[in-house]
Amino acid sequence: MISGQYIKKLAENAGFDLCGITPCKHLAENESYFREWLAKGYGSSLEYLERNLDKRFDVRHLVEGAQTVVVCAVSYKNPLGEGYPPGCRTKIASYARSRDYHPVLKRMLGTMLEALRRQYPGLTGRTFVDTAPLLEKQLAVEAGLGWIGRQSLLLTPQYGSYVLLGELVLTLPSDQYDAPFAGARCGRCRNCLDSCPTGAIVAPKVIDTNRCISCRTIEKESDSALPDLDGWIFGCDRCQSCCPHNQKAPMHRSPHFDPLFDPLTISDREWLAM
């Protein structure tokens, strides 16, 4: 059995801002909702979402012998995430202005896994950073990190939605698990629904990826059927920058997530060199 306190200390030492621990289980309620969402065609711009559904809702089908999921989060908010002036035509999602977070978080998780293997010789496990059919936002809720906001993003009390997630899936149980996050803290706020430039948030927690600027500029080439991109050329932060929880969130503390450029001042030559 693994010490939950030891896991969280490793996460802190690795540089993560948040860490929660949850037992592996079948997320049946989420599977029912997700299948209904797919049936309505809201995910048709992201065909890969229809694959590996059995693994997506039960991590035990993804990692043999899995018993525990450790969900870690790191804040990435920077001053450039506060929003763009009206009329700006070169908007880029806040997270994309810094280094690619995938290898950064992968190294952090790898450091944790190596330490756990030394401490618990019989342990095996895998690390994940947005690279597998893992329902990471819901796992974060199950691990007590936050709730799902009306814009369908994980919202944490400390850092809002400006967090990047990574997971450790382990084959031993923990001596303590965190309680799932109870309730939501959006109140009557509708800022994200009312601010989406393309109306992609068709209902609270329901996203039509065919309209979502972030999905269409990152996951799939845009076409004439897409509404006006409102100046966004990679990703979109509108449903985040308007959120009160994000407006009061602190800036990140890791140099890995310092912006590499300012889209408001970057030259044409610098754009082409990227």
Predicted regions located by residue number:
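Auxiliary alpha/beta "docking" domains used to position bulky ligands
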Residues: M1-R185, G231
